[in-house]
Regions:
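Viral structural modules
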Residues: 1-453
Length: 453
């Protein structure tokens, strides 16, 4: 795991009020050799803001990042699967034409060794051996695949123009069967648009769509474990609106990327010692690192919070739009036969407010933090097992509780994998040398045969 800070400037002519920000980090490259991994990617950002004339404007931005991560004593040959999330983001109007963006990126890199365990099987004829059984996991396949999904959403009749479309992909289930990996999930989509009234009031439409993708994999093994990340390539997301008898229909194309590593499990029977009564032998022992997938769990969780706007003179009149664009897991801790998962979901909310001091109404926005803590049951864990976790949004609902308070209720999907790193010493080679000299013991026994005296 590693954290990186990133800054960028976004051109936003005549900006006055930031209304909504959707930022999606995508890891485009994760490879290396020895003990270093190079990661590269982009943060796609879309900013909806109100300019000094009261016009709603949208700007897009791409900010690149790169880093080198020291993973220690990794295997000579390895594949890696990386995930990156925004653990914090801050936007502010730097000048009349520029918005300053500050990101904090969290990287989580899983390294899968491609070197096979070196061992001698327990069929060495003429040797006295001490066998042992070791359960290990092996990398079967790792790849990045591109695919696309398309859906339609009915926006209704009161639509002037679409301003923003943000979407996140959530993996719900992964299975390996035959020579294929099946990835199932949902796309959570939120469209912000202007209405046809004189004030160009904002409105939004949220929708959820199922997706299912199958990919061919090498060295398939039924019941294998799979580690999967799915991204929406936000810079290429397309929305085409069609007016059908006065009602607006939005056609949305989602270019997507799936990164996966498929891991199988096998039990090997090897030797921890060997000796011979007839020959001189040379035994080579090798200490080897192996890993084993202990278990995994996918579970949906309900989370909620209550937020109060900071300005005392300001009251909430109407909520226009809300969506969760980012969830950061701050803690994954083993607690007996369970995993304690803690984190924060960030919800962007656009609403109309009234200021009693100025006696003016206007659009404003907040990013509300929804903290959560839950325990997921997972048996057979050791205290030093490694937990690989991520969280994705499923749905969110925001309602006005009082004039200055909002209730937020959301559902998120938690994906937890437990991996155990093991070190074992196995006999990796046996060389049989010269025959030992015949026995010259001082005491001999002679057994009298039948008919002898």
């Amino acid at each position: 795991k590693k954290q990186k800070q990133l800054e960028c400037s976004i051109l936003a002519p005549n900006s006055k009020t930031i209304l909504a920000v959707s930022s999606t980090p995508v890891l485009e490259k994760c490879d290396g050799e020895g003990k270093f991994i190079k990661v590269e990617g982009l943060v796609y950002t879309k900013v909806l803001y109100e300019d000094i004339d009261g016009t709603n404007c949208v700007v897009d931005n791409k900010c690149s990042f790169a880093d080198v991560i020291d993973v220690g004593d990794a295997a000579t040959d390895f594949s890696c699967l990386g995930n990156v999330v925004l653990s914090d983001l801050d936007f502010k109007t730097n000048s009349a034409d520029e918005i300053k963006a500050n990101f904090v990126l969290n990287f989580e890199i899983c390294v899968f060794g491609e070197n096979e365990a070196q061992y001698v099987e327990c069929d060495s004829e003429g040797l006295c051996t001490l066998p042992t059984e070791v359960q290990i996991s092996t990398l079967l396949d790792a790849s990045t695949e591109s695919f696309a999904e398309s859906f339609e959403v009915e926006l209704g009749k009161n639509v002037a123009r679409v301003l923003d479309c943000s979407a996140t992909a959530t993996v719900k289930d992964v299975s390996v069967s035959g020579s294929q990996i099946l990835i199932e999930g949902i796309i959570v989509n939120n469209i912000v648009f202007e209405t046809l009234d004189d004030n160009h009031t904002l409105a939004s439409k949220s929708a959820t769509y199922d997706f299912k993708q199958t990919f061919e994999i090498a060295n398939a093994e039924d019941g294998a474990n799979a580690f999967v990340n799915v991204y929406i390539m936000s810079d290429r997301l397309q929305v085409v609106c069609e007016d059908i008898e006065g009602s607006m229909l939005a056609h949305i194309d989602y270019p997507m990327s799936a990164q996966y590593a498929v891991v199988g499990t096998k039990t090997i029977t090897s030797l921890t010692d060997a000796f011979s009564t007839t020959n001189e032998i040379s035994v080579t022992n090798t200490t080897q690192g192996v890993f084993s997938v202990v278990g995994s769990i996918n579970k949906s969780e309900k989370i909620d919070t209550n937020v109060t706007i900071e300005k005392d003179s300001q009251t909430i009149e109407k909520v226009y739009s809300y969506n969760i664009n980012n969830i950061d897991l701050t803690k994954t801790l083993i607690d007996g036969d369970a995993v304690l998962v803690e984190g924060i979901a960030y919800c962007n909310i656009i609403f109309q407010s009234y200021d009693r001091e100025t006696e003016l109404s206007g659009n404003t926005s907040i990013v509300a933090e929804i903290p959560f803590s839950t325990k997921l049951g997972l048996s057979g864990l050791n205290a030093d097992d490694l937990i690989i976790g991520k969280a994705s949004p499923v749905s969110v609902d925001v309602r006005i509780k009082r004039s200055q308070e909002l209730d937020i209720i959301a559902e998120i999907e938690l994906n937890i994998n437990a991996v155990r790193n093991l070190t074992t010493t196995l006999v990796s080679d046996i060389e049989i040398g010269e025959e030992k000299p015949a026995s010259t013991s001082a005491l001999s026994l002679y057994l009298v045969q039948k008919g002898q005296t």
